[in-house]
Amino acid sequence: MAAQLGLPLVSCHRGASQAASSSAHLVPGASAIMQAGNRRQKMRAPALRDRVVFARVVPVDGSVGFAGSSTEQETAVESATPTAVPSKVVLGRSSFPRGFIFGAASAAYQVEGAWNEGGRGPSIWDTFTHDHPEKIADHSNGDKATDSYKKYKEDVKLLKDLGLDSYRFSISWSRILPKGTLQGGINQEGIQYYNDLINELLKNGIRPMVTLFHWDVPQALEDSYKGFRSSEIVNDFKDYADICFKEFGDRVKHWITLNEPWSLSTMGYAFGRHAPGRCSTWYGCPAGDSANEPYEVTHNLLLAHANAVKIYRDNYKATQNGEIGITLNSLWYEPYSKSHEDVEAATRALDFMFGWYMDPLVNGDYPFIMRALVRDRLPFFTHAESELIKGSYDFIGINYYTSNYAQHAPVTEDHTPDNSYFDSYVNQSGEKNGVPIGPLQGSWIYFYPRGLKELLLYVKRRYCNPKIYITENGTAEVEKEKGVPLHDPERKEYLTYHLAQVLQAIREGVRVKGHFTWALTDNFEWDKGYTERFGLIYIDYDKDFNRQPKDSTKWFSKFLRT
């Protein structure tokens, strides 16, 4: 499809320059975009969590879940989507390949709390939420979060009781290196905390999947040299990663370098909704450059990732017998219409969100269409950097929540770029003619299970079928004013149908090896604060962070034992 759309195909076996040159003749679409004479339309900024899909799912008997007998204790799924699994599919753990990993996920700033305890230094999220509470929906912060720093044993017990295989969590960089650098000193209390967590997991039969960086840059590095806007951070991240591999790698066999670099670069530097809260002044930030900084930050993120992978492969992989990858997020995009322009726009949107990171990892350079449209604002890799980045993963983590429609936006060659988000010339929307692409869950997730399967198949076709873990997938309830929202049928439905799509993708040859539900517990949801709840486990923030299983946990536990 990519060649028909006038976009370059990615090769897993050729160098970046060769792939780019061989595909240049395939870009009539890019040329047409560059020469279009219409004025550029105003494009919609991303929705608040920026994952925005189209399928009505029809439960077989009006409910999705478990009945009484052992043969019925599996999830029956019927789908009205043309590419979904066959009309009735019975699902349980045994439906998936042997060794498939089921897990749940979290992130340090979202759950740990203890922001100024145990020797931890501040991160940019501490500064952002303290200095700009108006940027958070309920003016809250992660100072206490879910108190997992002190209640980690309770969380491990919940994982075990559910029957999950793995726990994906992140390490707080500033809890290990309070000043962000090796020279600033290693915090042994932080080392001990993560050792205790890892050991508790293993004692209970739960394997850790550890993310090194989930957006919480040490504030000291932001103050010293502007954080990920500077290439200086690459060596400091490499030192931090080296410490983690050395201290924890004898027990951690699954490493993720970065979580959702797109979210940091776009939400943190194009719109200022996330830390460090930078964007151009006309988007409401005191300082920033929405047209350039996201590209600079992404460039340094990719170099930091590649250098950390090299350290692991050179010094640890052979003896520790682990694997290392990166987690990328993406929506799936359906063309707004059947027109060639909208079909091409859907692929272009994928290039600007997913390909922005995946193309360098596979091919050593950014997508050709980005080079054509962004031009000199898109940084270049040296030959050595390109070779370092290319192939720097054992697996790819994919975070999927929802999908959007993609509509071609008319382009002018002489426009003045003001935001990287609009450089794709794609209007994105969760609705078409006032009709949502799928039922709305929470405030921003349109229920579209088919999008997950289509994204997985796209990655298989375009990027040489890498090993994949679904590292985040889940839905939310908006916080209720009264009562305890333990009744969460939408989560049960969401997970049922998305797992069915994962299974179908596996049957079609995609190398998916695991699925991690977001999230184990309710938590601090970034700019949403505590107004939305993604957890399998309810957190009572008013009563000592009491943990209570929601209704979906009963279903999920049975699913995992079937």
Swiss-Prot record:
Active-site residues per Swiss-Prot or TrEMBL entry: 260, 472
Species this chain originates from: Hellenia speciosa
Compartments (UniProt record): Plastid, Chloroplast
Stated name of the protein: Furostanol glycoside 26-O-beta-glucosidase
Function: Beta-glucosidase involved in saponin metabolism. Highly specific for the cleavage of C-26-bound glucose moiety of furostanol glycosides such as protogracillin and protodioscin. No activity with nuatigenin glycoside. Convers furostanol glycosides to spirostanol glycosides.
Tree of life domain: Eukaryota
Recorded name of the encoding gene: F26G
Cysteine pairings via disulfide bonds: 279-285
Keyword check for Transcription regulation: no
